[in-house]
Each structure stands twice: as C-alpha cells, then as structure tokens.
C-alpha cells in the first residue's frame, strides 16, 4: 500500500470495520460556524455534536476531511512551497467518539492501525502526553509497550486542546515519527524540537473536562475523542519520503507543470512548482465547493491563492495561462475520492483561465513598478511600506505577494509603513474575516433551545393545528406574557408555519386562543435552525407561556410560495440541461410574489437560451407529474442522484424531492426541506422576467408563476390594447401599424431634411443673394438656420461657395437651444482669410471653446443657440480686423 488514495481508503475502512460511521467530507465552507472562514480541521463538521447542540444516531464517526488554512489565525500561505509540510489545502484523517470510547480504545486504534495495518516500525514511533495526564502515560506503556523515555510529558498548550474559553476541553497525545539521525532535529520538548527529524503524524484529543472563562470547572459526563492525522504527512512516511511534496499526488501534479512549462522542478524553480501544485488543489476544491474569486471574505483569500500561484507560473516563464491546463491532472489524481471535482471541472477551468488572463496584466504592471522600486536595494534592505501599498492599491498586488516576490532577493517589506498607508484609506479588501455571526440576541435562543428542544414542524401535511406556547421573546429578551399592541416572537412546541430557510420566506398567518387572543403573524424565522419563531403583533387579548393556541397559516400565500419553490427546482434542472452540469445554485429567494435564482455561469444568457429554458419548465408544468417525496439518508440520496447544495446543513434523514420525467428518470431530484406543490400543474405557468449579473461568474434569473405570472400577462395585454386604440388598429395589427408609421416617419424626415436644405438656400438664389454683403472688399454671406441638421452644413457651404464665386460664407444651425457654426472660404481667398479664424470667433460668441478644420472649411459649436446672430457678427468682424 503506497498510494495516497490507498492510504485514505485503508484508514476509512479500518475505522468503518470498527463500528465507525464513515462520513463524507463536509464542504470547505462551514455550514455550522460563521466565525470560520474555511473548514480547517476534521472536527469542524462535528462541532455542534461535541458541544451538545446536536446528536448522532451512531456515537462513532470517521472521515477524510478537506481542509484549507489560508486565512485568519490558521494561515500557512506564506510558507507554502518553501517547507516540506506547509499546505493551503490538506486532508485530515480522523476518528471521533461522541461519548462512546475514550483514551484506551483511541490509543489502541491508533497503535493498531499504524503498526499492524500499515506496518510502521515500533521503534520509529514515540508519543507525547500532557504533563499531568498520568492515565495516558500508563496507557502508552501498556498498549504500545513504549519505554518511558519515548513517552514525553509536555507542559505547554500544544498538548491541551480547548474549544474557546468556554466548553469542552482536554489533554492531547501526539504521535511522532522518527525519520532518523541523518536529519537534524530533536524530539518534542527538547531544544532542537523545531528540526525535521521528529514529525508529528497524529494528534489524539481527549475531551474530558468542562471549562468556563478558561478555567476547568469539572468533568464532562460523556468524555469524547477527536483525532486528526494529516493525510499528506502519513503518505510521506508510508511512501518512505521525508518531504510531503515527494509523495505520489504531488509528484503527479508537479510532473504536469514541468511538462507544460518545460522547466524542471529543481534549483530556484523547485519552490515555484510546489506552490503551483499546492495552490492548484486549494483553488480547485474551493471553486468546486462554491467559493468564487472576489475582493472580500472567502473570495478574496481564494483570489490571493490563485494570484500567488499565477505569479510563480510567471517565474517559470509560462507564456500562456497555465493553471487551468493543470486541472485535468488534479481530477485524475483526486476525482475518484472527490467526485465534485469532476462535476465542477468546466467551471474550475474557466474561472482559473479568466483570473489568470486578468492577473497577467496586473502582474506585468506590478512587476515593473517593483523592479523600479528595488533597483537600488540589496539583501537586508527594506521596501518602503507606502510603495508596497501602492502596489496593492493601484495594481492589485496583495502585501504577501510583494513579500513573496522579494523573498528570494533577501529584501524585506516595511509592514508598519504598509499598515500606516492602509489606515489612511477606507479600503476593505484585506479586512480580516469577521464572519456573519449570530444576531445580538442569539443567547436567548440558545437558552430556549436547551430548555424546550427543537420545534416540531407539521407544515408538510397541515396548514393548521394546535400547540402550546413554550417561550415568548420581546425586544431580545424572554418574557412570560405579552399584551395587545406588543410585538413578540412566539415559540410553540409544534407548528405548521414554515420558518425562513433555504431561500424560502417564512409563513404568515394568525395565532388565536382563549379570551379573544389574536396574533397576526407577519413572518416566521428559524433561529439556530431548530426553533420556529413566529414574529407577531398581539391584536387583541394577551398571550402567556403555557397557553394552548391555534395556528393557521395564510394558505393562499403558502400556495404561491410552494409554486415558486417548485419552479426553482425545475428552473435549476432546465439550466443544467441547457447550459451544462457546471451550473449550481448560488442563492435563491422564494417569496409569494416572485422567485429569484442565482447560479454559477460565466456569461449572460442569450435570448434563445432564456426562451428554451422557459419553454422546458412550462413543458414540465403542463405534464402535471406528481411531486414525490422520500425520506433517505444523505448518502443514499446523493447516490440515487439527488442534488445536494454544498453548505446546506442536512441531518441524518433528508427529504428528497423528485419532479417530472425525462425518459425513465426524474427531471429534477434535489434534497430540500422546503414546501412544494403536490403536482407540477399546480404551478400554473412560469415566466422569466429578467436575467442579470450578480457578480463575476454568478447570474440571476427572476421569474413569476401562477397568479403573479397571470397578472404580468394581463398588464402587458392591457398595454397592447391601449396601444392599438391609440394607433386606431387591432391588437393583432399593432406590429404592422407601427412598422408602417416608422416607415412613414422616415419618409417625412427625409422630406423635412430636403425642405430644410431648400430653406437654407433662402427658397431660391434671389433671397440668398440678398443676404450677401461686401465686407472690407470681401463678399460675405452669413445665415442663421433653425432646425438644420449640423451634418448638412458642409453641403450648404459648398453650394454657397459656388454661388459667391469669390467670398466667404458662414452658417449657424440652431437645434434645441444649441448651435453649430461652419465657415467656408473660396480658393482665391484661402491665403488671405482663414475659415478657422471665422469659426473660432463665432464659437466664442456661442459660449463654446475651440473649433477647427482647414483654412478653406472649418466647423465648431456652442451651447448658447440664442446668440446665433452674434456669432455671425463676430465672424464678420474678423474680416474688418
């Protein structure tokens, strides 16, 4: 067993055969912790289980979790490519016990897998324990037979884990592999522990204590186990390598970049190939999990990683964009373990190509400035912070990219100066991730949830029902009662009201009770994802905790929401059929009056695309197939072809919605907890009313169904009828009538233009000649023409020159308050009088500037058409100067 894929499979099979639920990797965007930028450890998906907010049917689990560390306090980006073990993307192998087995079995599993299953030499392994954890110390002696000098007590926080200042915590035991005395370094806890001889390969966390404000306050009633082993590290050990980048997966990716660049991964180029291989993994997996490059939050970190890799591609001399051409090699290596890579491959390649083309322009300008700024700097010098900031602010060069670019030359960057320059601006591109967090009153919901548990939702089959009030929240605090006029959130033990989630708006309706109680529910929220909070105003009577009440949803509103929600599923399927499998949902709004659907696609949809998609959805609606619902495990549902939305929280049992038919398969199959129509015909009709961009690579469709669509059609039919009445024709003939009117208008415009030209000639040569005068021995013709198109001025001046024989002609055309002036000089006067001088004098009189042309023909204009006569006079005055 040598390949990384075999090691991953072996790990999961071992723990699966030992009673652990094999759990697929969660997405890189955490669904249960908005304070985290990315999933950065194997235990993140199980955080709520460890804290008691969730329970699992099987108390043991194992996974190979995708992780990214490139933002926040867990940021390995700067070191990637220059060390043997730093990565932005890695896989964390882990086994977990939720109140089941504890230290002895955890150590037994670890030792058995490493030495018996994988055959690692026992004399190459040693363990650390927290300095007061005598139990773990003795277990290592008993189970592994390790001598005491290879069980090292560590007193630092490295061997004690805590989930913040409050909550579960406990000691750790780390397993190290000794690469041999030919490599410098000492064992953990020694002065030389930072060397590379002894490498941590597995961390066992024993969650056994409860702490408050950083102080241990007692023992957990059900101690738990959380372990983590970096797949890349153990692959290096099992493949006989000391460097993670020498393992099979990285070798394949580096070989691909060597082939495409014709540059070997040696010497100064070694780090660049490693950076590209690592960053290819993180960027591709982030894109596959729905993160798109942007200038803030997760998207900004993704763009930083992309650009760092692309700069190293530039260092390798790549003449054309490189990153997108490496994606097939990554899919070949990891696509079997992570099918989402293959599904998203077109989107990954197109996004990488677009970003690299854009960044190559940025890079060219930035590198030029950087070279100029460092021309006089040598090893040990510092680049001024304001220069680094200019690179960032003007050329899009992140600070770490500048720092990385200067690393090889031994030039540092003045970070304090950079920060000072940054503070002077309100730029937020590099703002630290703060997460969305919970509302300010989130603690009250935690208190209620712990006391009463989750609200039971009955709304899939019912629109009314009775329930008991279990909590009331007013102004962010729990209250015992509420009176008429109060705004209050009502929590009951069971409800038919759908709480806003998954893009679907919450239900509205009424809550009634004894003694004339009436509450008008405006919407229903879903705090913590478990409670249903009915936001209501007490219209009459009073409500108190413990009351039995009746709940009635607004059925007409619910029906409209259901139609719109089912239509989004059909729309999603139609988009994928028409545009490709790269289309994934990026967001949605399902309201009573409309639906909005955001999806991944790089370009605007054509009119043909929109028409085809709309027609396909309506065909499914007319077929009126029954919508089927099945409850399944998430794994079975996905295996059966259901589309799961990454980032959505799915429980042990999910609802699988199947709609329509294509051949012998359902048209749409998705995991969804929302409310839907019983048959597709209930949607009525589907109409797309707009398609637009949301952000780079994300498009938005807004649409109407049912009554909303009917009203939309009626409004347009009324507009057509009114237009027909105005045009004195029938609705059927409006197009022909408008076409005829437009043709007639064009004809009249041509006739008008000819008439204006004729008028410009004074209605005949006699009138034009009457406008001629002698000015300082030069024949001068000056005319002001209302409504003349400026483009006709030259033709009129040519005619005037022919009439004059020898002389100067000036014409001012006035249109909508503005004026255009043009002047012409006959050839015999070209050396004496300049048309440019005449025009500039006239332009100044018209309140304008400039004017130009040739000595024999010039033109200009100004905003003050009322001064047209003054412009003629100013031009005439030039001849007397």
UniProtKB/Swiss-Prot annotation:
Cofactor binding description: Binds 1 zinc ion per subunit.
GO molecular function: alanine-tRNA ligase activity; aminoacyl-tRNA deacylase activity; ATP binding; tRNA binding; zinc ion binding
Record-listed Zn(2+) binding positions: 565, 569, 672, 676
UniProt xrefs under Pfam families: DHHA1 (PF02272), tRNA-synt_2c (PF01411), tRNA_SAD (PF07973)
Subcellular location: Cytoplasm
Gene Ontology biological-process entries: alanyl-tRNA aminoacylation; negative regulation of DNA-templated transcription
Source taxon at top rank: Bacteria
EC number per UniProt: 6.1.1.7
GO cellular component, one term: cytosol
Record keywords, A-Z: Aminoacyl-tRNA synthetase, ATP-binding, Cytoplasm, Ligase, Metal-binding, Nucleotide-binding, Protein biosynthesis, RNA-binding, tRNA-binding, Zinc
InterPro entries assigned: aa-tRNA-synth_II/BPL/LPL (IPR045864), Ala-tRNA-lgiase_IIc (IPR002318), Ala-tRNA-ligase_IIc_anticod-bd (IPR018162), Ala-tRNA-synth_IIc_core (IPR018165), Ala-tRNA-synth_IIc_N (IPR018164), Ala-tRNA_ligase (IPR050058), Ala_tRNA_ligase_euk/bac (IPR023033), DHHA1_dom (IPR003156)
Reactions mediated catalytically: tRNA(Ala) + L-alanine + ATP = L-alanyl-tRNA(Ala) + AMP + diphosphate
Reported cofactor(s): Zn(2+)
Principal EC category: ligase
Similarity comment: Belongs to the class-II aminoacyl-tRNA synthetase family.
Record's protein name: Alanine--tRNA ligase
Organism: Novosphingobium aromaticivorans (strain ATCC 700278 / DSM 12444 / CCUG 56034 / CIP 105152 / NBRC 16084 / F199)
Lineage: Bacteria, Pseudomonadati, Pseudomonadota, Alphaproteobacteria, Sphingomonadales
Gene: alaS
